[in-house]
Amino acid sequence: MTAFLIRSIIAALCLTLIVLPAQAIRETDSYDGNIFALYAGNGSLVPPAVTLADSLQAGRTSVIVYYLDDSRTSKAFSPAVSELQRLWGNSVDLLPLTTDALQGRADSDRTDPAHYWHGIIPQVVVIDGDGKVLLDEEGQVPLEQINSAISQATGLPAPQGESMSLSFNELNTEVISR
């Protein structure tokens, strides 16, 4: 009887210790973690290296991307943000910002990211070195449109050709410009 109880307890412990695999699904509004690491293969995008205030003060081109980690539209757009970093590198300040901290907050001035946010995600704002907004679009903004605004802001040529998405598994998609 004692042996049976011990075996039963061990079996119950083994069953409770079995960990189910984590599941991340791009087509849901569930929180899966850092969307850039998970869906774009680029966890280096967040947190941004500089603030909007620092970028504007330095006279650099700022590219703000408003997103939420638990939004299917943000998950789908994350590879495009990663591609922007690949294309423009150190020529622009790329600022992917989650909107959680902006909700219900009044904007103060043009150095505050809340000043530009409309309440829709994803949203892309391109601001040139003089503080002029060259692009302010919501949704799945085409990469070519963003590249054109960045080119106008920086004076650097935009990549030629169209972008295309390559999906190499059920989670990751890569956007490339050709």
Question: What do these predicted ranges mean?
Answer:
Residues 82, 93-133, 143-145, 150-154:
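Thioredoxin-like thiol-disulfide oxidoreductase module
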Residues 73-88:
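Typically the conserved alpha-helix immediately C-terminal to a functionally engaged Cys/Sec
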